[in-house]
Design a protein with these regions (language model features):
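Short, contiguous strand/loop micro-motifs
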Residues: 38, 59-61, 140-141, 190-192
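Active-site flanking residues adjacent to catalytic metal/cofactor-binding acidic residues
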Residues: 63, 87, 141, 167-168
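S-adenosyl-L-methionine-dependent methyltransferase catalytic module, highlighting the catalytic core
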Residues: 124-135, 139, 148-257
Length: 257
């Protein structure tokens, strides 16, 4: 899991917003007015450079699949996107520990209600008809390995994407010279029964081309020292060194043209 975040409560006069923030569970760390940062699990501002998002999204439309608390949807709005659709189901409909109220509170506090729309929709239901057409840019961050039918969802995501897909997911078996995947029955991966698959880099690139993307580029992988440090920590905690060392996160850009 990503590193824990810290929370900075609001300045005098921000008590109402601070209290609302404190009453909700947060996965994303989002800077809100008044010096308030939501107490998220992920330090999003720190990891944001890994994604190599376009510096300007002026005039672009963006689809954020698995938006959760909305950090990346709001970041797209900050970068000038003309229309952002935050889409989620698991984190908003009560199946997960997230709450849609957190997304709505952050959107309202940031003043993005006119730019960032939301839709409760499962990734398996995505289609241009279901979400109102194609989007220039699609974000699929931390979603793919939770899906029972990842290839089917990739086809749906490709149909909804006009230019660029940013994909972030679990990855392993990257030392193999051919496409490969690992399956995790039950709660074998990180103790989470919703974690199903890890693909290696070759497999991800091949699947992205198969579903309709013309080119792919890996923009981030954990360096060796980072994987070793994480594996050593897990071994100290009585967990598997090998599993942690060979598992990683990977971010790819896939383009239509």
């Amino acid at each position: 899991m990503p590193e824990n975040a810290t929370n900075h409560l609001g300045a005098p006069g921000d008590g109402d917003l601070a209290a609302q923030v404190a009453a909700l569970p947060w996965y994303h760390s989002i800077d809100l007015p008044g010096g308030i940062t939501t107490p998220g699990v992920v330090k999003n501002a720190r990891v944001l450079p890994r994604y190599h998002l376009p510096a300007s999204l002026a005039g672009k439309t963006l689809l954020d699949v698995g938006a959760w608390d909305g950090f990346y949807s709001f970041e797209a709005a900050r970068r000038g996107a003309a229309d952002v659709l935050a889409a989620d189901s698991f984190s908003w409909d009560g199946r997960g520990w997230g709450r849609k109220q957190a997304f709505e509170l952050a959107r309202r506090a940031l003043g993005f209600e006119g730019v960032v729309r939301d839709q409760l929709i499962d990734p398996t239901e995505l289609s241009p008809d279901a979400i109102g057409g194609q989007f220039d840019v699609t974000l699929l961050l931390g979603v793919l390995y939770h899906l029972e039918d990842p290839i089917g969802v990739l086809r749906r995501v490709a149909a909804c994407t006009g230019e660029l897909l940013v994909l972030e997911t679990e990855s392993t078996l990257n030392w193999l010279p051919f496409p490969a995947a690992r399956v995790f029955p039950g709660a074998e991966l990180n103790g989470d029964p919703t974690n199903w698959y890890q693909y290696n880099e070759r497999a991800l690139k091949g699947l992205l081309r198969e579903v309709g993307f013309a080119s792919t580029k890996t923009v981030f992988k954990y360096p060796l020292y980072r994987r070793f440090a994480r594996a050593a920590r897990d071994r100290f905690q009585g967990k598997s060194f090998r599993a942690a060392f060979y598992s990683s996160r990977i971010i790819l850009h896939a383009r239509k043209g």
